[in-house]
Amino acid sequence: MTKPTNKTIALIGAGIAGLSCAVRLKELGHHVELFEKGRSPAGRMSTKRGEDWTADHGAQYFTARDPLFIQQVDKWMADQVVALWKPTLKVFEAHQWTASNSKDVRYVGIPGMNAPAKQLAKDLTIHAGQTIDALKHQAGKWFLHSAESGDIATRFDELLLAIPGPQALSLVRELDPAAKAIAERSNMKGCWTLMARFKDKVDLPFDAAFINQETISWICKNLSKPKRTGKESWTIHANAEWSQEFIELSKEDATEKMLACAKKLGLDCAEAEVSVHRWRYASGTASPAPAFYLNHELKLGLCGDWLNGGRVEGAWLSGHLLANNVNS
């Protein structure tokens, strides 16, 4: 069998899907350059840090069911960047609190949720603070343009996008009708996230809670997770439908509404220092979900959690599977 030719590949987006894809492509002998609009890799596997506090403000934990991803999680645990999290979990629904009957095995990054992403990224070529805003395919090569730096000098054999569906759509709509159609189905919703830092311990009978039919969908004590230090902080996620409906609210108004709901649930943040983050694209998945997309003729691919059922595991697998197919 003929060995695949080593390629020079551009990968836009350095969240878990992009990092997983890049790591696998590098293992297969390809040269990969990642372009990430944020200051650092991780995407929604992110952790905010203050002088004396930390808070996971994106993905709160993850699970592992697929054998390939279980192997990756085992490696992360061996490298001490992931640990089991066994919280006391409650559920609030119809004005009542009950214990959660979930049997899920939950994992978190240590000392923050971004730790596994940083581990994946450590040997990769990542251009941070680079928003790719234009693409051109000419003479079998991909040409990229960055909003911050202008034309990218490297000409790429292959272009892979590991970004939310709506962002991918803006780049591929004039290039590939099939990719455009998939990106249009991404159905992604935003998420308002509030972080509250307290001087003193908060007395609540749980570490985290699923909240149903309220503005808020999740509250979590960050210090309940392993290897967290500093002052007590809680992460509060608004539910996806409310977040999407009010995605253009001012941060002040979103904070006010979320704090009112938190107080009703028993988490009074009147004495807390609070900040809020708007995730414009936080959740959602294409239906049907093809796991990844690759146009072999155009040398254009898509990966991400939104192509593979959501979740951290879905993102990692999407990137890994795309890399294997690029190589085939």
Mark where each language-model region is.
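N-terminal FAD cofactor-binding segment of flavoenzymes
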Residues: T47-L89
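Short beta-strand to alpha-helix junction loop
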Residues: Y61-P67, W97-Q119, E248-A254
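A conserved short coil-to-beta-strand element within the FAD-binding core of flavoproteins
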Residues: A128-F143
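N-terminal Rossmann-like FAD-binding beta1-loop-alpha1 element of flavoenzymes
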Residues: K7-L34, A323, N327
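Glycine-rich FAD pyrophosphate-binding loop
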Residues: K26-G50
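Active-site substrate-recognition segment that forms the wall
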Residues: M195-F246, D253, K257-G266
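Central helical "cap/lid" subdomain
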Residues: A42, E51, I152-F206, D268-C269
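Flavin (FAD/FMN) cofactor-binding core of flavoprotein oxidoreductases
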Residues: A262-L298
